[in-house]
Every structure is written in structure tokens, then in C-alpha cells.
Amino acid sequence: MNAALNQWKDTHAARLSQYSAVRVSGRVSAVRGILLECKIPAAKVGDLCEVSKADGSFLLAEIVGFTQECTLLSALGAPDGIQVGAPIRPLGIAHRIGVDDTLLGCVLDGFGRPLLGDCLGAFAGPDDRRDTLPVIADALPPTQRPRITRSLPTGIRAIDSAILLGEGQRVGLFAGAGCGKTTLMAELARNMDCDVIVFGLIGERGRELREFLDHELDETLRARSVLVCATSDRSSMERARAAFTATAIAEAFRARGQKVLLLLDSLTRFARAQREIGIASGEPLGRGGLPPSVYTLLPRLVERAGMSENGSITALYTVLIEQDSMNDPVADEVRSLLDGHIVLSRKLAERGHYPAIDVSASISRILSNVTGRDHQRANNRLRQLLAAYKQVEMLLRLGEYQAGADPVTDCAVQLNDAINAFLRQDLREPVPLQETLDGLLRITSQLPE
């Protein structure tokens, strides 16, 4: 009997430690936008609470800060129906999720609750008996991150020739509105070799989300995917949390030794949602009109992707740029955090050049780890040709260019049509890596030494 009790205690000790024997409660003293003010003794930042509504239902809220007078809670949904004096019951746990294979094929909200699909969801309440993990967590220590050495072809010539990705790499996809970033993201999901795909769709229009589900994801792709969605009409807390929920789900599959592809669209909308939370919490505005919490949370989010001893998370984060300017504060910060960036050009999109990837402006910081010397040399020569053509493009349009002054520029002008044809590609027509490399070598070999 004692042995059985000891075994039960060891099994459930970690779970029991999350709960308190005494339920301390409080009451709402003020509602300020998305923030609720109250007094809760012994509360901790990150703890979840249940707030009673006037109709008898409950609203989940999370403790996000304190002042000298009160505790600040951020509502995880719309605070409609909350009255001053409404009872608050601390749950004694932080936001946690349970992840298993039943999530594959499911569509979840920003907190991990099911939106579509016959599944339990990932959100773990206080009575959840699954093994759970925290949504807000630290990244792996740097000493536990293996070096990126394996290439991960995308089937897209413009990427595989000049910006070849590696398994476990974190890449930004920078684009303005209407440049085809969502279409490119879906194409990457179809083509890249991975076990599980986790989509984080933040701030999307509801119509676009439904079209994405119906037209971009076939049954085969859907069967190995998890979608975490927080549309533009959802609360700022849910939009910001969706990025962490998607990342935590990807981490859980990585811990099981799987190759995970994390596609997060977009970091800009995540930053905007966190800006709303920060302003409501009384944070001062800093660089670019953003509160300090945005610059704190961006690296905490993206550093959680990457290689581990067991598996990998290859992450692609989209970033919205206005007027094709890379000087946007979010874009500038994200570019400094990631292992590479792919830039989509509005000018190329307007010419019908798809995918509209500006190879000259795009870069991979781990390219030398996953490519051979011949590939690197050909990539450098391709960039040399593109740069040479860009320098004389205006002269060519004006009819003022005179050949013979520079053999490299002359070659760039002669090969421009061939290069553009090589970099263009139709959807759903992936090209093998070796075929891409052969085409790249065939073009760049014509450049004089």
C-alpha cells in the first residue's frame, strides 16, 4: 500500500505543485480597455484568472503587471459583460498547452482552443490531465544548439540558387502588401521536407483565412499541419499570444525528434498587438513608437526556434514593410535577430515576375554551411551580374547605354533575360536542387573571369 502511494506521489508531484490548497480571490475595481484592475494577494505575473461576467459565464484573464494599488489583468477575450465588483478567481497556473498527434489537422485560436476540427485543442485548463508545457518559456541554451549543416531545399529556384536555406534556420520574409508573401509561404509549406508544419496566422482578415484553408492546404498537407489563428478582430492579447502558442506547439514536436516547419505570418502584427498591450499597461513609448516590451519579446520569441539535440524547427517569419522601406523599426529589429532574410519587391510583382524575390537584397547568413564551393562561387557571380545590370538599367531605358566599356556589364545586359527567366517560376512546380544548381552554373559560367 505504501509503495503504491509513493509511486502515485512521485507521478503527480509536479502537477500537484501547480495548485494551491487555498483559493485567494479578488474583485474587479476598474476596466480600462483590455486591462482589468483588481487586488489579488500573492499573485504572480503570468497566472491565469477566471473573471465572472454578469450573465454567469467566465472570462479568462492573465496577470500582466502590478502597480502600488492594484493588480493588472489583460483579458484573453472581449471584456463585454464585466462589471465593477465582478469576482475574480485565480487559477494558480500559467498558460500551458498539451500537444500530441491529435492536434494534426486542427485549427486553433490564439490560446490553443479548437476552432475547427474534431480535436480537444491544446489549451490546458487547471483540471487537464495531459502532460503540458508552458506557452511562455525560455529558449534552449546556446550550448545545446547544434550547428546548422543540412540544406533544406524549397523547390524554388530564386531561393535555392542564391539563398539556400538550412534545417533549423530562422528566416524573415519581408514584403509589402500585395507582393505575394502568403502565396509564397504556402508554396514553401508544400515543397519543404518536414514532418510537421505549424502555421501561426496573426491579424489576418477572416475572409483570407478561410481562403487559405480551402485553396492553399490540400488534404495531405493539412494532415501534418497545425494552424493557430487569431484574426484581426480578436483581442490584442490573443493576437500576441498566438505567436507564442504556435512556437510552443512547434517546440513540443521538436522535442519528440521531428523536423518542424514553423510559418508565422506576421511578426509585424504581433508587434502591433504587443504595442497595444504595452500602452494599456502604462509603458512609455520608445524607438519607433514602440514600448520596450516589443523589443524584449521579439528575441524571446524567435530564439526559441532552431536546432536541438533531438529535432529542429525551421522558422519563416513574415514582416510587413511600408513603401518597400527596410527602415521600419520592426523590420530593422527582426533583420538583426534572424539568420537571413528574403525580400519581395513590389516592382517585380508589378511586372508579373513571380515569385517577386529581390535576390540582390536577400541574404542567408548560413549559406556557407550548407553549400559547396562551386555553388557559393556561382551565387557570387549571379549577384555580380544583377548588381552590374542594376547600375545601367536607367541608361538602358533611356537608350544611352554604350557597350564595350566594361565586359562584366556587357555580359550582365546580354544575360538579363536569361537570368529573369531562371528566377521566375510557376506555382506548384517545384524544381529539384540539382536542376537549379545546373541552371545557375550554366548562366554564371558565361561571366568573364
Curated annotation (Swiss-Prot):
Reaction(s) the record says it catalyses: ATP + H2O + cellular proteinSide 1 = ADP + phosphate + cellular proteinSide 2
InterPro entries: AAA+_ATPase, ATPase_a/bsu_AS, ATPase_alpha/beta_chains, ATPase_F1/V1/A1_a/bsu_N, ATPase_F1/V1/A1_a/bsu_nucl-bd, ATPase_T3SS_FliI/YscN, P-loop_NTPase, T3SS_ATPase_C
Entry's Gene Ontology BP terms: protein secretion by the type III secretion system
GO CC annotations, alphabetized: cytoplasm; type III protein secretion system complex
CDD domains (alphabetical): ATP-synt_flagellum-secretory_path_III_N, ATPase_flagellum-secretory_path_III
Documented EC number(s): 7.4.2.8
Residue ranges of coiled coil: none
Location(s) in or outside the cell: Cytoplasm
Gene3D superfamilies, per database record: 3.40.50.12240
Keywords, comma-separated and alphabetical: ATP-binding, Cytoplasm, Nucleotide-binding, Protein transport, Translocase, Transport, Virulence
Major enzyme class: translocase
Domain of life: Bacteria
Main location: cytoplasm
Chain sites annotated for binding ATP: G178, C179, G180, K181, T182, T183
Molecular function per GO: ATP binding; ATP hydrolysis activity; protein-exporting ATPase activity; proton-transporting ATP synthase activity, rotational mechanism
Family named by the database record: Belongs to the ATPase alpha/beta chains family. T3SS ATPase subfamily.
NCBIfam families: fliI_yscN
Summary of the function given for this chain in its UniProt record: ATPase component of the type III secretion system (T3SS), also called injectisome, which is used to inject bacterial effector proteins into eukaryotic host cells. Acts as a molecular motor to provide the energy that is required for the export of proteins. Required for type III secretion apparatus (T3SA) formation, proper protein secretion, host cell invasion and virulence. May play a critical role in T3SS substrate recognition, disassembly of the effector/chaperone complex and unfolding of the effector in an ATP-dependent manner prior to secretion.
Subunit structure: The core secretion machinery of the T3SS is composed of approximately 20 different proteins, including cytoplasmic components, a base, an export apparatus and a needle. This subunit is part of the cytosolic complex. Forms homododecamers.
Name of this chain's protein: Type 3 secretion system ATPase
Species this chain originates from: Pseudomonas syringae pv. tomato (strain ATCC BAA-871 / DC3000)
Taxonomic classification: Bacteria, Pseudomonadati, Pseudomonadota, Gammaproteobacteria, Pseudomonadales
